[in-house]
Amino acid sequence: NIILKPHSHLFLRKKYTKDLHRLESWTKYPNVYLAKFNETNILPFLHASDLMISDMSSAVFEFSGVGKPAIINMFLRYRLLHRIFPHKITKRLDTANFFLWEVGDTPRNYAEMLQNAKENLTNPDKNKEKREKLSRHIVGIVDGKVSERIVDKLLELNSNI
């Protein structure tokens, strides 16, 4: 099964109409679901999926946080403006934190992406260490006791007032 969850700008901006129609054409297949514009909560999609294939979307971090493999495509084709003036895209990207995208495979072309998809579906633990490292880096300790720590910290802060 394939779940397509496009960014909201595909629904909102006229210049992406062709891209949206391309995704809509996939829905003729019974195993393809295209999320609607008002389906903004991605959690149901995260839990229903075995693998995420994405661009540089923050949803990758959420998906990795639930312990599932992700593929971050690095073979993006930038708009003509950004190809002519690459500094404009570099200015928009936080290149200092590019290491975060290494939470999963980062294919440089379509053939690599297909190979990575097969590998991750066969072996979901392939990049498990990378996902756990990212989770610790962004979230901290993941032990189910965060609520207790928050309460303890609030009580501590309250007693200091």
What is the predicted role of each segment?
Residues N1-N38:
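Catalytic donor nucleotide-activated moiety binding site of glycosyltransferases and closely related
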Residues I2, I53, F63, M113, ...:
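Hydrophobic, well-ordered secondary-structure elements that form the walls
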Residues I3, A35, L51-I53, I71-N73, ...:
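Hydrophobic/aromatic beta-strand patches that form the interior of the parallel beta-sheet core
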Residues E39-A48:
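Short acidic alpha-helix that forms the nucleotide-activated donor recognition element
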Residues L46, S64-V66, N158:
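Short glycine/proline-enriched turns and hinge-like loops at secondary-structure junctions
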Residues H47-V60:
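Acidic donor-binding loop of glycosyltransferase active sites
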Residues S58-I138:
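Catalytic binding pocket for nucleotide-activated donors in carbohydrate/polymer assembly enzymes
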Residues D143-I161:
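C-terminal alpha-helical cap of glycosyltransferases
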